[in-house]
């Protein structure tokens, strides 16, 4: 999909997962 799903990668406790795996919602990645 797209980065619009990454609503809080920067604030996510494991936000790096958003960058590694791609467009993961912070609700899931965090």
UniProtKB/Swiss-Prot annotation:
Q: Specify one Pfam family.
A: Subtilosin_A
- Chief place where the protein resides: secreted
Question: What residues form the membrane-spanning segments?
Answer: none
Record note on temperature dependence: Thermostable, retains activity after heating at 50 degrees Celsius for 24 hours. Activity decreases over 70 degrees Celsius.
The record's subcellular locations are: Secreted
**Keywords in alphabetical order:** Antibiotic, Antimicrobial, Bacteriocin, Secreted
The record's Gene Ontology cellular component field reads:
extracellular region
Biological process terms from the Gene Ontology for this record are: defense response to bacterium; killing of cells of another organism
pH effects = Active from pH 3.0 and pH 9.0.
Matching InterPro entries:
Subtilosin_A
As for what it does, the entry says:
Bacteriocin that inhibits the growth of several Gram-positive bacteria, especially the food-borne pathogens L.monocytogenes, B.cereus strain ATCC 11778, B.cereus strain ATCC 21366, B.cereus strain ATCC 10876 and B.cereus strain ATCC 14579. Likely to act by disrupting the pathogen membrane resulting in leakage of intracellular constituents. Does not inhibit the growth of Gram-negative bacteria.
What family does the entry list? Belongs to the bacteriocin class V family.
The name this protein carries in UniProt is: Mejucin
- Organism equals Bacillus subtilis
């Amino acid at each position: 999909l797209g980065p619009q799903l990454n609503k809080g990668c920067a604030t996510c406790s494991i936000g790096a997962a958003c960058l590694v795996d791609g467009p993961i919602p912070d609700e899931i990645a965090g």
